């Protein structure tokens, strides 16, 4: 998609801070390597060294559209917010799965169980996805922060662009033809409920809310000419600004012109005939009947309204691709010279490589038992080799780069271990396991008197539970983080730890990437000498990094021998620590605690409690309310209020809060249904 005409504004970082510590050297070397044409570059950035800011300054140096990949939605949202603050005049977009809930279509042959696709789409995230693709086809100063969603099938960018509608003032456009065009690209006419992806008509005035906007476009006709174009507020109708030209992109990524659609229908019919003949020849009459009914229904929907449920399963025909070929993805919307940055690459790279087989194993059953045509197999994520072919130059960022990244870069990497704050890596103390719990309690009490927090990591769930009980008996405020706690509760637990509602967090795997806890001054690793996944070199370095954001950060490893993994982690931490101390001494830097970040968190909590629209504590308060004694009208009002709050939270990218509110709403609706069933409603 390099031949599309895009506006060409410059990337510009706007920040009160200048690159500091290792950042200037890292930015310069990364820029030099990319400018020399090196395809794969690794940034080995220690925890808390400002890798996100380095990425922003690198983008400013390179002046190229950039894809930034993160391992999950939460980290992607965090990165997008950071980059928006650093690049306020450029388009920083967010592209992740738009499902709040997703149950994929599946068939379990052993029990003859068909599971229909079931999902709940987050309207705001879908809007952000459309905004990402529309920005990529309109301008060059675009950064898209994405999860692995970017390797899943999407409509082709050429069809998406070709089916867009360009409006210009004084241009001759027949109003009724324009309305038909809007319907063709999946906009719905709704003169009452005016929402995203709809349009309304009042005489010679047509209002549209594009799929990627929060504002509406007003088109005023004078006869068959466009008299004026405005952006307006969708609720009040107030004019925001007048413009001379507007491009309206389709309301779905899966669009095709009439000729392409007609050809796709014929291709699907031809494939259906061949597949039915094959199934009948093999005596699979039930499967053949099942496939005929489903496909003919889908074809009728496509012919009548240009769309059907699960249309993505026919994407190969809609795109005009040969069998077995890779689908179009978000990567195809970028210009050819785009840059890719993979954050937490030691997690993200294996994710990319594993998506194809997981998807394929489910779909093979659907095809074999007559639920889908074989072409549905081509609606899939990219294979690793296909991903490699589509991305150009790539920067891998991680505190512990994986073997693949290091091999791809020839074993070379750019190092960023000096923190702008002057904080150094924690000291590591190896102690014997004999009497380790009493020693740990002594260390915890020393920290709690200074209002500092402690993380304790164990090897088994049973050990974590027993340790938590024992610490509670000894008067220590402690919580236990385990696999039964969902993501939202986990975020709440960590927030409570930061705010000092308790002092010690015990868990099995506390090394999760992006765990930012500046108040933690001690990380205790029990059974550090038991080799395995949880005590590998990478795991130990990640766990040690949790104490690297505190001035007095310390790590205690309880072990009776020093394993190879321990030795490497200790040596690497000591090497970084010596380098950091020498730098601080040379430049007269006194390590500063991250007080500002803590204040920001406290401020956000206080603000959210004060706001009536989205208080972070609402979900907790509601769950404690005795809703069974609440009048039905009041309960319905509460559900409506929480739904509004959920929408507000999602628009502000506060997905943890939105998810918590969603769960509360589901519980309240269940309560309401119970009342209706017994005649209280």
From Swiss-Prot:
Protein name: UvrABC system protein B
GO molecular function: ATP binding; ATP hydrolysis activity; DNA binding; excinuclease ABC activity
Biased composition (Polar residues): 607-616
Biological source species: Corynebacterium diphtheriae (strain ATCC 700971 / NCTC 13129 / Biotype gravis)
GO BP, one annotated term: SOS response
Gene3D superfamilies on file: P-loop containing nucleotide triphosphate hydrolases, UVR domain
Subunit: Forms a heterotetramer with UvrA during the search for lesions. Interacts with UvrC in an incision complex.
UniProt superkingdom: Bacteria
């Amino acid at each position: 998609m390099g031949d599309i005409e895009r506006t060409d504004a410059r990337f510009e970082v706007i920040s009160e801070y200048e690159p500091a510590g290792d950042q200037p050297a890292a930015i310069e070397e990364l820029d030099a390597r990319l400018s020399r044409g090196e395809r794969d570059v690794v940034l080995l950035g220690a925890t808390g060294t400002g890798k996100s800011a380095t990425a922003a300054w690198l983008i400013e140096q390179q002046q190229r559209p950039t894809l930034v990949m993160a391992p999950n939605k939460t980290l992607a949202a965090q990165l997008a917010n950071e980059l928006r603050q650093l690049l306020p005049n450029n388009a920083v977009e967010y592209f992740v799965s738009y499902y709040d809930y997703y149950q994929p279509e599946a068939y379990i042959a052993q029990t003859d169980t068909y599971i229909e696709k079931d999902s709940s789409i987050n309207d705001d995230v879908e809007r952000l996805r459309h905004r990402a693709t529309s920005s990529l086809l309109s301008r060059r100063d675009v950064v898209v922060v994405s999860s692995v969603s970017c390797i899943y099938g999407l409509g082709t960018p050429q069809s998406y662009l070709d089916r867009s509608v360009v409006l210009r003032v004084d241009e001759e456009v027949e109003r009724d033809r324009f309305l038909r065009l809007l319907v063709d690209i999946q906009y719905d006419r709704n003169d009452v409920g005016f929402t995203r992806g709809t349009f309304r008509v009042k005489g010679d005035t047509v209002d549209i809310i594009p799929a990627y906007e929060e504002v509406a476009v007003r088109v005023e006709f004078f006869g068959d000419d466009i008299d004026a174009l405005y952006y307006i507020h969708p609720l009040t109708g107030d004019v925001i600004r007048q413009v001379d030209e507007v491009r309206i992109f389709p309301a779905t990524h899966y669009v095709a012109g009439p000729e392409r659609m007609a050809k796709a229908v014929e291709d699907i019919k031809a494939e259906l005939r061949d597949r039915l003949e094959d199934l009948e020849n093999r005596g699979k009459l039930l499967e053949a009947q099942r496939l005929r009914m489903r496909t003919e229904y889908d074809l009728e929907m496509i012919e009548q309204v240009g769309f059907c449920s699960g249309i993505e399963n026919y994407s190969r025909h809609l795109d005009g691709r040969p069998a077995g070929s890779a689908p179009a993805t978000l990567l195809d919307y970028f210009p050819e010279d785009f840059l890719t940055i993979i954050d937490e690459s030691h997690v993200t790279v294996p994710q990319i490589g594993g998506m194809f087989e997981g998807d394929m194993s489910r779909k093979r059953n659907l095809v074999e038992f007559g639920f889908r045509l074989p072409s549905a197999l081509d609606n899939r994520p990219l294979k690793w080799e296909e991903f490699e072919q589509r991305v150009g130059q790539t920067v891998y960022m991680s505190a512990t780069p994986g073997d693949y990244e290091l091999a791809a870069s020839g074993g070379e990497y750019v190092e960023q271990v000096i923190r702008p704050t002057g904080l150094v890596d924690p000291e590591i103390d190896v102690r014997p396991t004999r009497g380790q719990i009493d020693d740990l309690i002594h260390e915890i009490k020393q920290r709690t008197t200074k209002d500092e927090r402690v993380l304790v990591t164990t090897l088994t769930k049973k050990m974590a539970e027993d340790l938590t009980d024992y610490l509670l008996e000894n008067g220590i405020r402690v919580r236990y983080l385990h696999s039964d706690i969902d993501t939202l509760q986990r975020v709440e637990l960590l927030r409570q730890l930061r705010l000092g509602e308790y002092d010690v967090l015990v868990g099995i795997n506390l090394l999760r990437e992006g765990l930012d806890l500046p108040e933690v001054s001690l990380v205790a690793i029990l059974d550090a000498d038991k080799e395995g996944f949880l005590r590998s070199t990478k795991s130990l370095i990640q766990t040690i990094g949790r104490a690297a954001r505190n001035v007095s950060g310390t790590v205690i490893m309880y072990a009776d021998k020093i394993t190879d993994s321990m030795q490497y982690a200790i040596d690497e931490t000591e090497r970084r620590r010596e380098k950091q101390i020498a730098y601080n001494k040379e430049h007269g830097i006194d390590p500063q605690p991250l007080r500002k970040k803590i204040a920001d968190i406290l401020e956000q909590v206080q603000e959210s409690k004060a706001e009536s629209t989205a208080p972070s504590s609402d979900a907790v308060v509601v769950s404690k309310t005795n809703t069974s004694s609440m009048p039905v009208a009041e309960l319905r009002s509460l559900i409506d209020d929480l739904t509004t709050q959920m929408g507000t939270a999602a628009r502000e990218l506060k997905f943890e809060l939105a998810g918590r509110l969603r769960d509360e709403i589901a519980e309240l609706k269940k309560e309401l249904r119970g009342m209706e069933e017994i005649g209280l409603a």
